[in-house]
Amino acid sequence: MVYNEKNGGGIPPVPLSLNTATPWQNVNLHNDQQTEPQLKSHPDTDPRITPYLGLRARLSQLWFNRWTILLILVLIRVIILTANLKENLGDAKAKALSACTKVEDVGSAMASMPYYMSKGVNVMAAGSMQKAVEAMASVLKMILTGVQAIIMFVINMYIGTFACLVAAFIHGGLHVATAVVEGATKVMNDAISSITKGITDDMKSFQSAIDKARDFINSGIGLISKDIQLPTINIDSHIRDLQGIKINANGVVNGLDVLDQKIPTFDEAKNLTESALAIPFNLVKGKIDTAFSEFTIEPTIFPTAEKQALSFCSNNSFLNDFFESLITLVYKAKIAFLVVIIILALLAIFVMGYIEYRGFKRERERAARMDANAFNSQDAIYIASRRWTADGGMRLAKWWTKDTDSKNYLLIRWAFAYATSLPALFVLSLAVAGMLSCLFQWVLLRQIEKKAPELAAQVGDFAGDVVGTLKQVSNNWANSSNAVVANMESDINSDLFGWVREATESVNNTLTVLDDQIDHALVAVFNGTVLLDTARDVVGCLIGRKIDAVQDGLTWVHDHAKVTLPRFDDDIFSAGAAQSMGSDGDLSSFLAKPGAVTTDEINEAVGKVIRSLRNGVIQEALITLGLFLTYVIVVLIGVMGALIGWATPGKTRGEGGQQFGGRPPSFHNHNGFDPALAPSNAMVGNPASPHYQNEKFGGGGGMHDVASPAYEEVVYAGRVPVGNTRELITRYPSHQRTSSYPTVESPDPMPHGDEKVPGYFTPI
């Protein structure tokens, strides 16, 4: 911009080569009253003394940076948690020990139940066995009587049948023989008499004829000669002898009568058999009456189980060890968390120290970026105060859109700034701290949950100890009682059934004697006759085989005449407890409280601690989730605002929506402000100015080959109304230094932004 003497006054500006003062010390030569105060020069002090914090001062505050403070808060929460958890574990330990003592008492009482039950069982067993033995003796006597009667019935049946048949056969035969002999004798005697009489008569007739013939002859001869003497036939003596022949059947008949009288009726055999059979049976019955008349089984013969005193809590340090291990686990977890958090806090200190160091070195470098990217003075303050979030927003905006002068670029930076504001980051940091706290608590919870099954297993072992003791007591009592039963069984088998065996042997011997007696009777009757073998066959068929069958049956009775008394089961007192243990794997047994099917007091003590810790973790996790969702809502609000601004069309320049102006000049290098970079007089509002082009496109000084005169004013972010925009550009004084050029007056009042504010930048 050229100097206008008409408008600028009679005094030209001081050339830059002759101006030794900095632009910060220029004064308005056209204003005699000096309405604007002059900037004070820097104090002449030690350069190490500054009103702002240097690197050493910043590093001295690293120990309470935000992340370290958050980690310390998490550490305090963990310490409080472990302290409460230790107290809860102490209470759980006391409750578990109390519950274990109760379980021990219940287990001892239950393990002693066989002591009380065995007395009643002994009385019941003794009474039952005595009644059983008495009933067995009575039944045995009745069986013996019945067997005796059956044997006698069978013997009498077969002997009587045989006797009747034999007697009828023999007597009938003898009677027939007697009648035949007597009839034959009579017939022969009558025939002999008749024959002798006929012979006698015939001989008489013949003798008479002979006598007549003699007489005749003699009469004839006597005439002639002497009489003829004929022999006389005299057979009277022979006739008399023949008549004297008498067939006497009395001897034969008498013999048959004698044989008939000698045939036995087997009454003797029957009576002998009855007498012989009655002897062993009566002997056994007498012994049974004698032995069991005063037979008693006293309950005292059975043993009594001993009382049991279980001590799986008193003499078992598992519960103590278990809870001590949990407390030790909590302590170790606290130490581990302390170490981890302290290490993280130290790392945060070192990281923040490195960040501060880098930030301090780059702070001056950011001045150029601030000059190049700041939208207005407020944006410059934001970039300076929130350098990391501002830098992140600029990087995101540049990644999204390459046009840094576009509205979208500004909206993206605005959304990122909205999401990374101090309240939003505070909420996010609380959520992160809550997540860390929940993570530490969850790790501790998982460790305790892993240890809990050991307690459940040990409680199961407690129940197993009770059941094992019950089994041992039951087994010992059953063995002792079964020994008593075995002795009683041996006595019964040796006495009572020994008598039965003796009786069966006697009966067998008696039947053998009976068989021999029958054979003797047959021999006595039929010896020397053809009927002996026939009689033996008949007797063997009718009686002998039946007697053999009876003897076989008695032999079987003899071999199996013994009793086996029932024994007591080994688990007579422990079967119920074992079944209750096997019905539910979660100890729904006699050790559980009434109404508690799957838990018991011991597990409940630890379960309460676990549930309390889990509920605390869930509650804090929900709070953390709420904080995180709050931050997400903030982020969404920022994104929605950016999207709405993105979708809303901008106002035109005539509507006061478009901004126009140059960027602020940059008088800084990597060491800070450099007066050599500031030209004496420059008009940024002049597009032809090389410095203006450099500031707009270069992002910081460096192209100052052409020094424009009077670079003392800056035009920035003015609102330009409709009209001659070149003449309506608002000019702002730079560092209390007014230009020698007059202020451009606008014919119309400016909509806004027409105030003249000291400094480089004025917010829109």
From Swiss-Prot:
InterPro entries, per the entry: PRM1
Region (Disordered): 653-701, 735-754
Topological domain ranges for the Extracellular compartment: 1-61, 171-334, 446-624
Glycosylation sites (chain numbering): 271, 315, 479, 508, 527
Recorded superkingdom: Eukaryota
Recorded topology in the membrane: Multi-pass membrane protein
GO BP term (any one): plasma membrane fusion involved in cytogamy
A GO term from the CC aspect: plasma membrane
Key words, A-Z: Cell membrane, Conjugation, Glycoprotein, Membrane, Transmembrane, Transmembrane helix
Membrane-side (Cytoplasmic) residue stretches: 83-149, 356-424, 646-764
Transmembrane segments: 62-82, 150-170, 335-355, 425-445, 625-645
Compartments where found: Cell membrane
General function of this protein: Involved in cell fusion during mating by stabilizing the plasma membrane fusion event.
Similarity comment text for this entry: Belongs to the PRM1 family.
Protein's UniProt name: Plasma membrane fusion protein prm-1
Organism: Neurospora crassa (strain ATCC 24698 / 74-OR23-1A / CBS 708.71 / DSM 1257 / FGSC 987)
